[in-house]
Amino acid sequence: AGLPEGVFNVVLGAGETGSALVQHPDVAKVSLTGSVATGKRVATMAAETLKKVTLELGGKSPIVIFDDCDFDSAVNAALAGNFYSTGQVCSNGTRVFVHEAIYDNFVDEVVARSNGIAVGDPFDPETQMGPLVSQQQLDKVAGYLSEVRSADDVSLLCGGDTDFDAPLSGGYYVSPAVVVTDNEDHSVVTEEVFGPIMTV
């Protein structure tokens, strides 16, 4: 790219590598995209050397749908905002607020369309949603789904299946899930799942 040697470096590694970079006195700026817990640790370490810090931490990006919306476009936006890249995008709109006048119709339509999403091999042209990135991520998403299934104040309306027949068996697949709740404090409502779970 024409940059002088040492101007741009890519250093790969896990937490230990990140800690070394954050604590190093010659590093002037740290930018992190990650969890809230990791962000707190990075900010604390960076404060020791007064580094500039930019943090983009896990949370829920909202989609707000009013009763005067173009209904079909709103449903499409919610589906794309939740299930694009199997929900593994930081900016996915995974917390959907819907005006009460259209709430029931919206939920019914989202559930019907979610049930129709073709989950499969990303190389198959018929596939609309592929797998999660790893077993670790599948386990994390399955953990959220387990919490939802055991909660009295949260309802799983569709999806959340991880048991697929061959050739998908053994893969990191989960069907698109739609969850409804009034509990604003439940983990599936407040935390970034990074998987195909829409919360309405």
Regions found by a protein language model. Give the residues of each.
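Periplasmic-binding protein-like
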Residues: 29-33
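Short loop/turn motifs at secondary-structure junctions
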Residues: 4, 26-27, 49, 193
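Conserved beta-strand segments of alpha/beta enzyme cores
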Residues: 6-9, 153-155, 199
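Short, solvent-exposed loop/beta-turn-alpha elements that line the ligand-binding surface or hinge
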Residues: 189
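ALDH superfamily catalytic-core signature
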Residues: 35-184
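PLP-dependent aminotransferase-like
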Residues: 1-18
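Glycine-rich nucleotide-phosphate-binding loops and adjacent flexible coil segments
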Residues: 196
